[in-house]
């Protein structure tokens, strides 16, 4: 189980990301469309003024059950440990133990 403070920090980052998502996308599209160097510098400065934690790369994907930050399966949203236990219990439809 992950520390509660780390889980809450990630929730805060996700809220910030959602808050500034539209503004960040608008700035990035304008940055890619312009040709002048001066305007690119101004747009880049505006982009840097946004909060650091509002960047999507700062949000960590965590297991929704345990909060584990590593070894997550995106399709299920759980870590490898939880995935294994849920598969053994038959809680994941369509997942079977492989044998050959």
UniProtKB/Swiss-Prot annotation:
Quaternary organization: Part of the 30S ribosomal subunit.
NCBIfam families from the UniProt entry: PRK08881.1
Gene3D superfamilies associated with the record: 1.10.287.1480
Keyword set includes Plastid: yes
A single cellular component GO annotation: small ribosomal subunit
Source organism: Cyanophora paradoxa
Stated role: Binds 16S rRNA, required for the assembly of 30S particles.
Protein name: Small ribosomal subunit protein uS14c
Record gene name: rps14
InterPro entries: Ribosomal_uS14 (IPR001209), Ribosomal_uS14_bac/plastid (IPR023036), Ribosomal_uS14_CS (IPR018271)
Pfam families associated with the record: Ribosomal_S14
Keywords: Cyanelle, Plastid, Ribonucleoprotein, Ribosomal protein, RNA-binding, rRNA-binding
Location of this chain's protein in the cell: Plastid, Cyanelle
GO MF assignments: rRNA binding; structural constituent of ribosome
């Amino acid at each position: 189980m992950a520390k509660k403070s780390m889980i809450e920090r990630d929730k805060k980052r996700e809220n910030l990301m959602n808050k500034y998502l539209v503004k960040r996308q608008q700035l990035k599209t304008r940055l890619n469309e312009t040709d002048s160097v001066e305007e690119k510098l101004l747009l880049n400065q505006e982009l840097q003024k946004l909060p650091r934690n509002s960047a999507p790369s700062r949000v960590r994907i965590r297991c929704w059950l345990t909060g584990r930050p590593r070894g997550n399966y995106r399709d299920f949203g759980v870590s490898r440990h939880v995935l294994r236990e849920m598969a053994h219990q038959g809680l994941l439809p369509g997942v079977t133990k492989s044998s050959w």
